[in-house]
From Swiss-Prot:
Pfam family, one: DUF1656
Membrane-spanning segments: 3-23, 43-63
Subcellular location, record wording: Cell membrane
Membrane topology: Multi-pass membrane protein
Protein name (Swiss-Prot/TrEMBL): Protein AaeX
NCBIfam families the UniProt entry points to: PRK11594.1
Assigned protein family: Belongs to the AaeX family.
Keyword annotations of the record: Cell membrane, Membrane, Transmembrane, Transmembrane helix
Keyword Transcription regulation assigned: no
Highest classification ranks of the organism: Bacteria, Pseudomonadati, Pseudomonadota, Gammaproteobacteria, Enterobacterales
An annotated GO cellular component: plasma membrane
InterPro entries: DUF1656
Amino acid sequence: MSVLPVVVVFGMSFPPIFIEIIVSLMLFWLIRRAITPTGLYDLVWHPALFNTALYCCLFYVVSRLFV
């Protein structure tokens, strides 16, 4: 059970995991913007798989921080 309450925005209620998804998505965009100019994506075999794994790792870290 999550400690965070239900979030209500303009009459629509969102579960607590919605905040975690948004925070991890913002972190993902920031890290991806930082990684792209460095040329790291040239070393990655499958960029889409790398992005998915990066987002999953970030979501796990963020969800552990919120609980």
